[in-house]
Every structure is written in structure tokens, then in C-alpha cells.
């Protein structure tokens, strides 16, 4: 994915759609993909249009009382519509149907190819299919938005990462005990500090993440790599862990 750059024009290819599955504030760090579930095979997407109603603001004693005067009234984020390749066995599309059946308000975000995002909240107002003879069957969805969205323009100042490190690069841990690794991004004020960490061999060590710290738990003696990848996939680092018997 390109480094976020909100100052350059960008085409729509590469735009992705995500639904929030966490319990926190979806607006807190929208550039992070932690607690977000991506919907696959998006064919087209039309974000909600911001509109405002008008109200009559004319008075009998206006200087130009014979001319209509209006003011901006209640605002709306409209409806977001999108089309997916229909895959009834795919977990994300099953969750979409559950979202419609439950009728609750959920957050979702649109990540654009330049790395910026729009975040909306809404409920699924329609869900259907389009079936043609010569093209794949598609799932059509419309979400009616609720409240004020968080737009990419609200976060126009983006500090992109230039690097990522994991320290220490190698260390040891006794079987049954744990050690920690620290992830850092450069420069210090990076906007998106999200990352993913896994154990290359869970029979030897397992990992858990809290903030910028990775906790490695020793399971069995041997060597194991802990690959760490930045949230946007631009940077990667590997820490080597030696698990000792005692």
C-alpha cells in the first residue's frame, strides 16, 4: 500500500472496505486495521454524500423581505452503497447478513489507495443480489449512515513511517517463562503505529501483543522467529528467539 499522501490525486483502484468488530472507539485510530474486518472482492463503492436540509430564515422586516432567505439545517451522511462478488461461504459476507438481521448501528471505514480513510457509522438498510448470465453474481448492499462521519480531510496531516525496528533482535527465554520485544517506528511522531506479530512455530513459542510490546512465551526448547509486519505492509522485521530447557 502506498505511503499515506493526502496532497496528491489518486485513482480508486485499490480501495478497500472494512467493518469494525472491536469494542472500543472506532474513531480513535482509524488508520490502524486492528479490530477491523476487511470485506473481500469489492466491485464498486459509493460513499455516503454529506447533505444538509434548509430552513426558512426570512423575516417580515428584512431589508429584502420579498426575497427568500434560508439557512443550513440538519445534516446527513446519506447512504453508502457497495457491490461485492457474491461468496455466501465467506465470513465477511455472512457477517453482513447478520448485521442486517440484527439491525444495529456499526462502524465501517473506507481505506483509499493513498492510505487515508473515511469512517462512518450506520445500519444495513438493504441487501440483495444481482444475477446475470455472463458475469459473476454480485451482492449489493446499502448502509444508511448515522451521525457525523470522520472524513479523511479531518486528518489531513499524516506523518508516514520511514522505518520500523524490533528490539532486541535476538534473545533467549526459558521454557514456561516469557520475554518481551519492543516495536518502534521512525520517525517518532508516526501517525499509524499498527503492526502484526506472529510466531513462526507455535510449538516452540507463542506471542501476544499489548501496545508496542510483544510478549513471547517459551513453549519448547529450540529456535523460533517472530516476524513483525507494519499495519500497511510497508515494513517488516524479525526477532530470533531461543527457547532453552532451563
Curated annotation (Swiss-Prot):
Pfam families: Big_2, Phage_TTP_12. GO terms for biological process: symbiont genome ejection through host cell envelope, long flexible tail mechanism; viral tail assembly. Gene3D superfamilies: 2.60.40.1080, 4.10.410.40. One of its GO terms (cellular component) is host cell cytoplasm. Residues 204-246 form the Big-1 domain. InterPro entries: Big_2, Phage_TTP_N. Residues 161-239 form the BIG2 domain. Keywords: Host cytoplasm, Viral genome ejection through host cell envelope, Viral long flexible tail ejection system, Viral penetration into host cytoplasm, Viral release from host cell, Viral tail assembly, Viral tail protein, Viral tail tube protein, Virion, Virus entry into host cell. The keyword Cytoplasm does not apply. Forms the phage's tail tube composed of 32 hexameric disks. When it encounters the appropriate initiation complex gpM and gpL, it assembles in hexameric rings that stack on top of each others. Multimerization ceases when the correct tail length is achieved through a mechanism dependent on tail terminator protein. This is Tail tube protein.
Amino acid at each position: 500500500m502506498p505511503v499515506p499522501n493526502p496532497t496528491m490525486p489518486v485513482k480508486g483502484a485499490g480501495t478497500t472496505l472494512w467493518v469494525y468488530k472491536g469494542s472500543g472507539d472506532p474513531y480513535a485510530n482509524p488508520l490502524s486495521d486492528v479490530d477491523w474486518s476487511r470485506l473481500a472482492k469489492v466491485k464498486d463503492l459509493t460513499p455516503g454524500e454529506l447533505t444538509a436540509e434548509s430552513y426558512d430564515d426570512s423575516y417580515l422586516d428584512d431589508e429584502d423581505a420579498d426575497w427568500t432567505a434560508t439557512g443550513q439545517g440538519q445534516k446527513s451522511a446519506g447512504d453508502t452503497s457497495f457491490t461485492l462478488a457474491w461468496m455466501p461461504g465467506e465470513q465477511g459476507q455472512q457477517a453482513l447478513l447478520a448485521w442486517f438481521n440484527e439491525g444495529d448501528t456499526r462502524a465501517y471505514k473506507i481505506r483509499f489507495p493513498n492510505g487515508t480513510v473515511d469512517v462512518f457509522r450506520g445500519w444495513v438498510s438493504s441487501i440483495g443480489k444481482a444475477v446475470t448470465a455472463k458475469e459473476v453474481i454480485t451482492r449489493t448492499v446499502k448502509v444508511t449512515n448515522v451521525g457525523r462521519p470522520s472524513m479523511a480531510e479531518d486528518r489531513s496531516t499524516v506523518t508516514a513511517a520511514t522505518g520500523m525496528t524490533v528490539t532486541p533482535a535476538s534473545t533467549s527465554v526459558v521454557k514456561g517463562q516469557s520475554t518481551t520485544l519492543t516495536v518502534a517506528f521512525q520517525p517518532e511522531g508516526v501517525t499509524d503505529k499498527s503492526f502484526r506479530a506472529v510466531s513462526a512455530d507455535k510449538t516452540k513459542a507463542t506471542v501476544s501483543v499489548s501496545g508496542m510490546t510483544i510478549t513471547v512465551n517459551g513453549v519448547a526448547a529450540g529456535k523460533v522467529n517472530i516476524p513483525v509486519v507494519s499495519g500497511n505492509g510497508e515494513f517488516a522485521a524479525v526477532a530470533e528467539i531461543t527457547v532453552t530447557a532451563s
